[in-house]
Swiss-Prot record:
Changing N116A: Loss of RNA binding. PANTHER family: PROTEIN INVOLVED IN DE NOVO 2-RELATED, RIBONUCLEASE P SUBUNIT P38. Keywords: Coiled coil, RNA-binding, RNA-mediated gene silencing. GO terms for molecular function: RNA binding. The keyword Lyase does not apply. This is Protein INVOLVED IN DE NOVO 2. Residues 253-508 form a coiled coil. Forms a complex with FDM1/IDNL1 and FDM2/IDNL2 that is required for RNA-directed DNA methylation (RdDM) and that functions at a downstream step of the RdDM pathway and downstream of small interfering RNA (siRNA) formation. Required for de novo DNA methylation, siRNA accumulation and siRNA-mediated maintenance methylation. Required for several post-transcriptional gene silencing pathways. Binds double-stranded RNAs (dsRNAs) with 5'-overhangs through its XS domain. The keyword Coiled coil applies. Residues 9-20 have a biased composition (Acidic residues). Interacts with FMD1/IDNL1. Forms a complex with FMD1/IDNL1 and FMD2/INDL2. Can form homodimers. Interacts with MORC6. It comes from Arabidopsis thaliana (Mouse-ear cress).
Length: 647
């Protein structure tokens, strides 16, 4: 049951002018059509939303239509313009939006009593389509200018609606003399419109005001005459025929029935073709899903192989590291035992010297000197042992930190890979669910209830998988932050190692990336000039090219595509003007030194264009890893330890 919505006090207190009635009526019609104002209480009961205080609260459809039309077309001053406009909007809403449903709700016994004019008429008779009626003998008056005037078609239309003919429009016909006294009554294009038109024709015929009555020459005619437009009206050489030919065609009921049957058959054929196309599309989607599943299985197998290989390499590195640490610990224990043995020997010797009896001064002096030397050696050995123990603890701590960092990095890699596998699996499930969803959507268009139910289940699963994917993304971000902190710690260790190894002359050391080598420039100057001022000239040229290297606007590189690969790399542009002049002037030595420095700067510090330091494996001529640097540090520590032991 719908509830009546009452207009606000602002709407009741304020009124509108007659020029604003159409705009206000359109607004009220949209409110009615949008459901803001309820009109229907039940299939056969209606209510006026603008008259809530009326004694009669429930109307039949025709009664409400008559009430709304009477108020809307009232000439009484008691009715405000707003009331008239709102009731006219109600008339429009009843006619255009509730007419069909109201006629369907009419009792079947009443419809049968009225009969069906379509069944009783000649189906081969040509009628004007869209269905139209003709009204003649409409009263007119003569104006001062001699032109005729008559009432508008809306009043006549409302009258016909109240009589149950339900026209969509009544259009008076005008010519140069004004109102012609005739009008065209337009009905809906469907079978209901034909039904109303035939009722219109039958009503006037029964009343003695049909077409035959109008054509009889039996004296003056009183009242309106009407009939449905037929072929003779359509072909007539008058204002009615001209208007009918402009707005309609001649068709029989049989032709329209056949045309409707053809359209229905064409619709069925199109639907069948659409079903076949949907089945074909569904088959293609299933085949595509099968191909993608096979490709995904291959990728998963490949990933599993790579993962196993990665695990084996990590285990091998860990075993080598543990073996190296164990070796350091064993050497440390060996040195401790050696120092302990030496200390005991010195104590025994001191005890022996103390027990000797020295009778002469020379022997006592010698004994005193020996005792002092032994005490000095013992003190030095104790200090060395303390230093050794301190160094051992630092090395052990460094090795333990390296082992712990590697284990943490290994665990993070395993977690990330496990998370990546889980994320890929969920993404695969999401893609498969989306593929199934596309298939089900095509199947759901055929109206299968089971398919619709399966689509709902897939929607629910898809939402759960997307929620799991969001949780994994959140966890992934947490792991990325932890990995960044670990990388920062490794970078700090790398910097500390660089500071320690700056002055070392070993295979693993520190190299200044982007620094020009002096020797090629000196050699080139010696070949080009005499021995005088060679070094000064070389320094000047060297400083000039160091300035060029720092210039960020100078970028003598070009991008080339690698063979059998899709990526591009930057290489030296040998067509650069400065480099060509350098090679032509000083030869290959300085040219190679400059290009090498350019490549190093472009690789290690392209934005800053200044010299940076890196751990370098001079033997292999490549960047050294942190593990190589730590290994070299431990080797140097062992050498220093052995030297101290030998001393």
């Amino acid at each position: 049951m719908g509830s009546t919505v009452i207009l606000s006090s602002d709407d009741e207190d304020s009124d509108i002018s007659e020029s604003e009635m159409d705009e206000y009526g359109d607004k009220m019609y949209l409110n009615l059509k949008g459901g803001k104002l309820k009109v229907r209480l039940s299939p056969q009961a209606f209510i006026c939303p603008y008259c809530p205080n009326k004694k009669k609260t429930s109307f039949q459809y025709k009664d409400l239509l008559q009430h709304a039309s009477g108020v809307g077309n009232s000439n009484s001053d008691k009715r405000s313009a707003k009331e008239k406009a709102s009731h006219l909007a109600l008339v429009k809403y009843l006619q255009q939006d509730l007419a069909d449903s109201a006629s369907e709700a009419e009792p079947s016994s009443k419809r049968q009593k009225n009969g069906n004019p379509i069944q009783d008429c000649d189906h081969d008779e040509k009628l004007v389509y869209p269905w139209k009626g003709i009204v003649v003998n409409i009263p007119t008056t003569k104006a001062q200018d001699g032109r005729s005037a008559g009432e508008s078609g809306s009043k006549l239309r409302d009258e016909y609606i109240l009589r149950g003919f339900n026209p969509t429009r009544v259009r008076p016909l005008w010519n140069y003399l004004g109102h012609s006294g005739t009008a065209i009554v337009e009905f809906n294009k469907d079978w209901n419109g034909l039904h109303n038109g035939l009722l219109f024709d039958k009503a006037y015929t029964v009343d003695g005001h049909g077409k035959k009555d109008w054509l009889k020459k039996d004296g003056p005619k009183l009242g309106l005459y009407g009939w449905i437009a037929r072929a003779d009206d359509y072909n007539g050489n008058n204002i009615i025929g001209e208007n009918l030919r402009k707005t309609g065609d001649l068709k029989t009921i049989a032709e329209l029935t056949e045309e409707e049957a053809r359209k229905q058959e064409l619709l069925v054929q199109n639907l069948r073709q659409l079903v076949e196309e949907k089945k074909k599309d569904m088959k293609e989607i299933e085949e595509l899903c099968s191909v993608k599943s096979e490709e995904l299985n291959q990728l998963m197998e490949e990933k599993e192989k790579n993962q196993q290989k990665h695990y084996r390499e990590l285990n091998a590195i860990q075993e080598r590291t543990m073996s190296h640490i164990q070796k350091i610990v064993d050497d440390h224990e060996k040195l401790k035992r050696l120092l302990e043995s030496e200390r005991k020997k010195l104590e025994i010797k001191c005890n022996e010297l103390a027990k000797r009896e020295v009778h002469n001064g020379t022997e006592r002096m010698k004994l005193s000197e020996d005792l002092e030397q032994n005490a000095s050696k013992n003190s030095s050995l104790e200090l060395a042992a303390m230093e050794q123990q301190k160094a051992d603890e630092e090395v052990k701590k460094l090795a333990e930190d390296q082992r712990r960092q590697k284990e943490e990095l290994h665990e993070k890699i395993i977690r990330l890979e496990r998370q990546r596998d889980q994320k890929q699996a969920i993404e695969l499930e999401v893609e498969q669910l989306k593929g199934q969803l596309n298939v089900m959507k095509h199947m759901a268009s055929d109206g299968d209830a089971e398919v619709v139910k399966e689509v709902d289940i897939i929607f629910k699963d898809l939402g759960e998988k997307e929620a799991q994917l969001a949780d994994l993304d959140k966890f992934n971000q947490t792991l990325i932050l932890r990995e960044r902190r670990t990388n920062d710690e490794l970078q700090e260790a790398h910097k500390e190692l660089v500071n320690i190894m700056k002055e070392w002359n070993t295979n693993i050391g520190v190299k200044r990336m982007g620094e020009l080598v002096t020797k090629p420039f000196v050699d080139a100057m010696q070949q080009k000039y005499c021995q005088q001022d060679v070094e000064d000239r070389a320094v000047e040229v060297l400083q000039l090219w160091e300035h060029y290297l720092k210039d960020s606007d100078w970028h003598p590189f070009k991008r080339v595509k690698l063979e059998n690969e899709d990526r591009e790399v930057e290489v030296i542009d040998d067509r650069d003007e400065k480099l060509r002049e350098l090679k032509a002037d000083l030869g290959d030595g300085p040219y190679n030194a400059v290009t090498k420095a350019l490549l190093e700067i472009n690789e290690y510090n392209p934005s800053g264009r200044y010299i940076t330091t890196e751990l370098w494996n001079f033997k292999a001529d490549k960047k050294a890893t942190l593990e190589e640097g730590v290994t070299c540090l431990l080797d140097q520590w062992e050498k220093a330890k052995r030297k101290r032991g030998m001393a």
